[in-house]
Structure formats: C-alpha cells, structure tokens
C-alpha cells in the first residue's frame, strides 16, 4: 500500500481502451467567457494597470520581442553545457535554438514565446499533440549570456527531466502560473492537450477573479449606481493569501480548478518539512519552495502578516526600504510584538554596509543557478544548529571566512541566553527524528501537544511516521499510532493529511478511524481519506468524484500513471494496471520505484521473466535501496532460483537490517538451500526484531523438528503459543510425542 502523494510529476497511457473503470475521460475546456482581460481594467484603473504592466507578473510569459530577443540569438552563440554543445542563431528571419532533441540528434527548434523576465528567461518550443516544452537553456539579461538552469547535471534525452521530457512540459509544469485562467485540458486516451487561457502572464483576473460582469456593469453605471457594484465580492486576507499561494508554493494540484476566493487546501497539497531533502529540520528551505510553504511555519503568518503587508500587489515590490518596512511593526512591543532597537540590534547596525533585516531573517539561496530566492520562514540564525546538525545559519552565509565556532561565540555575546530559545529545541528534536533517532520520540510528542501552529504540528507527524512502524519497541509504536489516530481530529487539514498518510499502510485496522474524514471540511483531507479507503470507495459518490478528479488531472505525468496503475492494481484490476505501469516507466525510465511497481504487478500475474528484467533495472538504478533488493529476492524465489534469491535477500538485510520480514524470508531461503545454521540465525534475528510475530518462532520450530532438535522446537512452539494461543499448527506440533 502507498500513501497518496500529490506531486508535480504525474502520468497516463494512450494505448489502452478507455472505460469508466480504467481511463477517466479528459476534462472539457474551461469556461473562459467570464473574463474580460487586463486591458479592460486600464479604462478606470490606469495607475494600477501601469504599475502591473511593468511587473514580472505581467510579463511572466510573453511574445517574442526583437528589442529583447535579437541580442539573444544574434550573433550566433555557442552554448557549452555538460557534455553537450548547443547553438542560438537566427535563420531565415527566425530565432533558432540548435540542441539535442528527444531522439538525441541535434535539431533546429524555433521558439514561440519566452517565459520569465529577471534574472533569467527561457523559451517555449511547440511540440506534438498540443504539448509545448520549456528549454533548459536560459538567457541571463544582465550577464548577457546563455546558461543551463540545471548547471552540470547534463540531463540526457530520454530522461524525465530533459527539456524534451515530461518534466519540462509547459502545459503541466509552467503554464498554470505563467498565464491567466489556464485550463490544461489533457486527453489521456489520445495523449493530447487542448490547453486554453485568457492571456499570457499573470493578469489582473488571476488575482481579482473574472471581471467581465464587473466591466459591463461599470460601463452601464459610470456613476457607481445607487447600491454600488453588485458584481464585486470582498475577499478576506486569507483568501488573498490563497491566491498568492496558489502559485507561490511547492505543491501538488488536486483539481486544476483553483478560483479566486477558494480555499487553498481545497485545491493543493503543499510540500512541508519531512524526511525528504526539501527542507532543513528547522524549516529553512533546502530545495525550492516558492515562498508559501515555510511562510506557514513563521511567527509572522500566525500574527496575521500577509503578502500584501509587505508587497505592493501591482508591482510585487516591497512597499518601502526593508528595515523601514519591518520597523512598521517592530518599533514597539504593543500587541505582543518583539520591539527592535535598530541602533543596537544585529551585528552591523550602522554605516553604509549596515545589515538589512532580510540578511539574517530572510536568507537567500540560488535556484536555477542564478535565481536568488528569499526564505520566507523568517527564521532566527542559530550557528549551534549548524555545528550539531549541519543546518545553515545566516551568520556564516555572510561571514564565509569565519568558522561556525566563531559564529556561535559571536551570537552568544550579542544575545546570551536568548539563543537557547524554543525554536532550537524543536529543531534539535526534528533533526534527531529525521536521523531515525527514536529516543527523540517522547520529547517530540511533548512538543507536538504544545504546538499551536498547525503547519508545525503536521511537520511533527511527518517526522514521527517511521515510529508508527518501529518493530523493536511495540510500546513506542503503539503510542505513536494512537497519537496519529487522535490527530485525525485536528482542525488543521495539513495535520489531518499527515496523519492519514502515516496510518494508511495499516489498512483495515485504521479504516474506521479514517472514514469520518471523507466528510472533512477541506478537500485535501477528503481525498487523502478516499485514497486510504480506495478499496471500498464509490467513485460516483461526492468524495469518490473528488478522488477521480485528482487521478484524472495528473494523468499527463509519470507519477499520475503510476498512481492510477496502483489504484487499478489494488482494486482488483491488475491486468488493466500493467499498461499504466509501463507508461510510467516509459515516461521516466530512471525511476526505480516505477520499475519496482511494474515488476511486482508482472510477478503477481505470473510474468516472472518480465518482472525480473524490471526488478534488475530497478536495483541497478537504486543499488542502496533495500526494498528493491528484497523484492528481487522474492522474484528469484518464485522462479526457483534460490542461490540468487538468497544473495538478493542477504543484500537487502545488509542495507536495511531492521526489517524483520526480510530476515524471515532470508531464513526460509537459507533453509531451502540446506544452510541450517544460517537459516536459524536469520530467523532468530527476525524474532529479535519483532518478537510479537508468531510466524518467526513457528518457522524456527519447523526447522528444528526437521533437524530432530525437539527441545529447541518445543521452546520455539511455546513462544508461538504465547503470542497466539489459538495457533492451530503450533498446537498440533506441540502435542506430538
């Protein structure tokens, strides 16, 4: 079983006959007639329109412009990147990018539009079946040079992340946030897009909603009418925040239908700090998050700060110089605020190089090689966490010539006991959990119970999830499971979602606890619950349709194909699932999990030779993943190739030594090969890891009986009956003379 992961990379199969049960119909074209276009706003809102027109939002996607693009392609430019060399040129009056295509051959590609303004822009190349691709080669308008946004990764044709692959597909990856009112309109049967949008760039109606009715009413009532304009709806600060967050967050899309005024968690599943390498344990960004994700974790978010508190909405620029902006709130301690004295606060309070608040509390990280992004978690630098866990601090980001110990000493001199703040304790606990240090679980549960921020509560649950399955400490395991069950009732959709993800692999044992969330207030929790209960869900029910919508929307990416294949496979349609697994592998051939899922499905259908080929490739792609080695051993076992099975299973337990079932399977393989001592050792290890499982001592008992070691067999059978007094086979063997 697998948790419902809603990512940016999802997928489909165009060769399978579409039926209601196996290939959901494509979404029809979105209704765009309610939009008037940004130009109409200029009639009454000229100042705001002019500010917007010059903004990055307005120019997020644009037509080609000789004033901007001539110098990019003329004179001819050679672009060296990784092992490849590409060229930008002008041919027959057209801009041309000569680079490796999908087949690996050098070809001329003619860009149709540009994406982005500063500090870089990329070009959109029209493709087949309504798809467009975004170049990995970008132009730096300041340095006036080409570069590869992936640096020296040297992505190759055929890879998901190559510019010709699904990972660089404009319709799926770029257009929703670089156009206004975008509708993807993907047909999974034909593998074709019929994408539509109102206008290029982030237009007025991206943030204000469709305004055609407003424009028409205003033209008919230039005096404003007696009761005012009935077409306008007033948004709350959180609704405005959701508008910004719909693009300024790293998230999975649940619907593809977010509209101004909607709840964020009815449409998106944001990435949050967890066991992956996306965030540091203290919440700082490691990989790109596009601002909103960590902003939810900040004190400022909880205090009511919203995007337009600091940013002018039409220019997107900050409203005033950085320090003045912060001091608007931090001049006094009214309302529980932390008062800042600019004359003494920080390490460089005076002079022309005086520190900006953002230097310490909004540290920058470069993405796409040259795009520096501020961390919006508004964290407080703590060099001590750098020394203990490698978590970066803003002090050493600036003072790169100084040691971490110097930064620790300097911070202690300036702030003293204030450095030992609750955020340090929280970061330490989460860092230990991320290292699978279960001695931190007790303190984590204590902090979780006291945590007021729902986003942080969800982080605790994500970090605690491995403890739900800790085999060596049943008391700890049960305690954490109960906390997860209790947190299903948390008011935060992030917490509900994290709890469902943690519990879902337990299957029917937790179904009754999860089932009430089919009626949760937010779609995020509802679809997670529906996925967890997919074996019983009616796809024609309201929540079933929501789950179906999610599965449909993501069918143009390999993760979507894989998820749909899992759905079919786990709901009794393994034959139908195969082509979707195959499509996931074709679209992302370097994904070991996709090959593993495909191999398991093939194996269950008895197609062992094909399963073995996929499993071997999965192990080659992820040689340090014990799960794949274990599954390879099982396939070899099914094929009767016991020496290879034993070797693969031994590799699996060497990589992940705490999986009791893997030791059990290794023990069975060793026994079949006649390796009695090795079999006993493996089974004893399985029992040591999880002494509450009757299978392990029972297997030992049968092996001891085969060797006529009756005393040891009786002892093992005694342990079986302690665990399960009704174990029929153990009782029968124990009663034998």
Roles of regions detected by a PLM:
Residues 438-448, 470-488, 507-518, 539-549, ...:
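Amphipathic alpha-helical scaffolding segments comprising HEAT/armadillo-like alpha-solenoid repeats
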Residues 505, 535, 570, 604-605, ...:
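Register position in tetratricopeptide repeats
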Residues 15-25, 29-32, 39, 47-116, ...:
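Primarily the internal scaffold of c-type cytochrome electron-transfer domains
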Residues 493-496, 523, 558-559, 592-593, ...:
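Helix-start (N-cap) detector for alpha-helical repeat units in TPR-like alpha-solenoids
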